[in-house]
């Protein structure tokens, strides 16, 4: 077994001492329960949000399709983000909630597993892919939509323990 690559002087773990990109060796880490929650929004025109809520768009049920896309995105994260480990996810939940007071859809994704590395990237990817799917399905009526505030909300497990966004 090789030793995990040490972090660089500035704490980055995906580079070796020569500055080359590496996938971190997690073989020596303990398996723990790990959960990550990420969130984000798709801001849009009021008429676009109304069409989503009323299922009035030609491409179909935007929220259901985006929910499935987010789940698929979490599962495909290591295919999209080069240094992510392939993980045996035990849970992926994606929620899309219309927010008419702010003309947006709020997206939340929760990913979980028992393993040696966290699921933050999977949760973030789920939110991003769900948001991109909302955009794709609505772009014919609103090209000015914006994906905003994609961020990690919380994570538990692993050596660093629990973290919650302030």
UniProtKB/Swiss-Prot annotation:
What is this enzyme's catalytic activity, as reactions? (8S)-3',8-cyclo-7,8-dihydroguanosine 5'-triphosphate = cyclic pyranopterin phosphate + diphosphate
> Superkingdom, according to UniProt?
Bacteria
GO MF:
cyclic pyranopterin monophosphate synthase activity
**Which InterPro entries does this UniProt record tie to the protein?**
MoaC, MoaC_bact/euk, MoaC_sf, MoCo_biosynth_MoaA/MoaC, Mopterin_CF_biosynth-C_dom
The residue range of the signal peptide is none
Q: Where substrate is bound, by residue?
A: 83-85, 121-122
The biological pathway it contributes to is: Cofactor biosynthesis; molybdopterin biosynthesis
Please describe the quaternary structure of this protein. Homohexamer; trimer of dimers.
Name the family the entry cites: Belongs to the MoaC family.
Q: What is this protein called?
A: Cyclic pyranopterin monophosphate synthase
- Organism source for this protein? Rhodospirillum rubrum (strain ATCC 11170 / ATH 1.1.1 / DSM 467 / LMG 4362 / NCIMB 8255 / S1)
Q: Gene for this protein?
A: moaC
């Amino acid at each position: 077994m090789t030793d995990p690559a040490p972090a660089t002087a500035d704490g980055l773990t995906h580079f070796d001492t020569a500055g080359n990109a590496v996938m971190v060796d997690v073989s020596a880490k303990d398996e723990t329960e790990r959960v990550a929650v990420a969130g984000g929004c798709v801001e849009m025109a009021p008429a676009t949000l109304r069409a989503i809520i009323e299922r009035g768009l030609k491409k179909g049920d935007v929220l259901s399709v985006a929910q499935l896309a987010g789940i698929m995105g979490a599962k495909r994260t290591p295919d999209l983000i080069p240094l992510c480990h392939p993980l045996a996810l035990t849970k992926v939940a994606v929620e899309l909630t219309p927010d008419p007071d702010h003309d947006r859809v709020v997206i939340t994704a929760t990913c979980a597993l028992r393993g040696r590395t966290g699921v933050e990237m999977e949760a973030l990817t789920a939110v991003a892919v769900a948001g991109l799917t909302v955009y794709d399905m609505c772009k014919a009526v609103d090209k000015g939509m914006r994906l905003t505030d994609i961020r990690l909300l919380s994570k538990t497990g692993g050596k660093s323990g629990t973290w919650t966004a302030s």
